[in-house]
Amino acid sequence: MCGICGFTGKDNTFLPSMVKHIRRRGPDSEGNFSKNNIHLAATRLSIRDLKNGNQPFVHEDINFVTVFNGEIYNYNYLKKKIQEKGYSIKTNCDTELLAPGFKIYNSEFFSMIEGMFAFAIYDVTNDQLTISRDRYGIKPLYYSLINNELFFSSSAKSIYNLNFFQKRLNVKSL
C-alpha cells in the first residue's frame, strides 16, 4: 500500500500536512515535487523494484512526473507495447510505465491497465495534471475543488483536515 497526494496552487505549505495523513500507507520512502503551481507527494511501500521505484517518479526524457499507488498486473505486456513505440524503460517499477503509456495512448492507456491503481501524472511541458484511478475504485483517490484549486489524496483525511476545508452535507446529492 502506498499513498499519494497533491494539489494545484501557489502556496505549497499544505503539502506536509497532507503527507502526514498518507505516511502510514508507505513506510519505505517518501518524496515530493513542486513546480509551476503543481505539488505532488508520495509515500511508498516497496513491492516491485525495491531500489529504483522511489516517487515522485521523474521521467526526464519526456518531462513528466508521476505519483502512483497500486499494482499493474499486465506490466510485462504494457512494457513491451511501450518499448515497441521507441520508449526506454529503465526500471522494473510499475510507476515508470504510466507516463510514456499516457504520452503514447492518451487516456485510452488507463483502460489498457489491468490492475488496481490511483495516480497523478504531471506533464511539465504542457503544465497539465491528470489524475485517475482503477474503474472499481480498489485504490482510493479522493479529490476536491477548493477555491478553484484541485486537492487529491489516497486518504480523505489529507483533504478534510486542511484548515480551510469546510465539511458540509450536500443535501441535493442525497
Description of each model-found segment:
Residues 1-174:
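Cysteine-centered catalytic environments shared across enzyme families
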